[in-house]
């Protein structure tokens, strides 16, 4: 944390094909070891599969999937009087997007399809239909927050 003021957030440039900042952020989350070209090929390949199989605009399908993945509530550990409580808190909009992208990439990598392009395409299509592991993670997070609603007054 800086001593002088806040750090300015860098603005992400929209990707050249779909002109979407969210797609650029997905490319950045998918990227490993600075290999942006590989990440871009995977995402555009997955979008081609989505377009061929559903016939819908892949960016709209992706945005619908993100809407279904992004959490509204999460729990945060808070120490009160020697014991830790899981306190439910609302998720900030930028963190919602980050968590959604992180979960989408994480659970795409765990899928059983042959290539990463297929895995990502299937996970996006599943999430758009409110199924899949990333949506389940969001529901588990909400369930945890709901179960600990009694500790909401410890919010800070």
From Swiss-Prot:
GO terms for biological process: translation. Transmembrane segments: none annotated. The keyword DNA-binding does not apply. One of its GO terms (cellular component) is small ribosomal subunit. Gene3D superfamilies: Ribosomal protein S7 domain (1.10.455.10). Keywords: Ribonucleoprotein, Ribosomal protein, RNA-binding, rRNA-binding, tRNA-binding. It holds the Pfam family Ribosomal_S7. Signal peptide: none annotated. One of the primary rRNA binding proteins, it binds directly to 16S rRNA where it nucleates assembly of the head domain of the 30S subunit. Is located at the subunit interface close to the decoding center, probably blocks exit of the E-site tRNA. Belongs to the universal ribosomal protein uS7 family. HAMAP family: Ribosomal_uS7_B. This is Small ribosomal subunit protein uS7. The lineage of its organism: Bacteria, Bacillati, Bacillota, Bacilli, Lactobacillales. The gene is rpsG.
